[in-house]
Amino acid sequence: SNVLVENSQLTNALGNCLSVDGGNVTVNSSTIAQFYPFDALRASALDFSGFTHPLVSFKMKNSIVTGYSEDEIMGLKPADGSENAFNYDFANCIIRTPEVDDKEKAHYTDVVFEDVKDTVNYGHKHFVLVDADMQRYDFHLRKESAAIDKANVQTSTKHDHDGRERGDKPDVGAYEYITNKE
């Protein structure tokens, strides 16, 4: 199957916020955040796999993948001996996963790996409001977010999730930073 996810907010699920098992999938200018408050055994923000079906292409561009866990991305390669494809690329993204080793780096272009110890610019601090106690969330960007002005102007969508123009310096994720939003 062919799937295009653009300007989308996929957040706070008990299971994975986005799960891909094979296909030809592009995710662009989206926010995928796992801040589900009711179960410590919640799944990851993003799970992609070529285990059951060939992952012909998984491309994530100009997107944020974050959450409570130190690793919010799970990639499952096909079993040894399988002929299933497992093709993936991340570009101009901010992702909460440990930095990859040299043999994996070819799959990551202009990607920021979140520093889980940075409590100012990453994780829930990207966003205007993450209040698990009151179950109130606003995934628009805060002025401290590392996502501001970091998207690729050539590949980012021209408008954000709210229909606002992204301009010459688009932000990573589903929403453009708005000065008066906070």
Regions from the language model: what does each represent?
Residues 2-138:
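Predominantly extracellular beta-rich ligand-binding scaffolds that present long acidic/polar faces
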Residues 135-182:
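Surface beta-loop-beta hairpin patches that serve as ligand-binding interfaces in beta-rich domains
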